[in-house]
Amino acid sequence: MALTFPSPEWTAQLKTVVNNDQAYAQSAKTWEGDFYFIIEPGPGIKQPVKMYLDLWHGKCRKAHIAAGVEDKPPEFTISGTLETYRRVFEKKLDPIQALMTRKLKVQGNMMKIVRSVKPTLDLVNCCSMIPTSYPDQVQA
């Protein structure tokens, strides 16, 4: 059954997939950083949705839809439209290219992400493993 992106269920499933993915565990074994992934308002999204991920040494320590502000701001904030995230998850848009062309906007040390291409691609691969539907495909 497909899970709707973005949703608490999809986010919880991503944590499970990341924590069971050997490729991500290996490529991100030295990665330390947390993120807000913000899905901007648009078709199917009435207000911004903030998904929080805490990635640490190849594992996901926390993953949830953030209702407010975290105790401390995350190291990175990446924001984009639902369609951009969909294209990245469906591997129709390279995530690094999306960052460089500002289809996905980054706050934080972009060079740290650019130097971490393999973990970035493996994280996107984890996202791609989740059977996903989108709010513009179903009534939200």
Q: What residues fall within each predicted segment?
A:
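Feature captures hydrophobic
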Residues: M1-A140
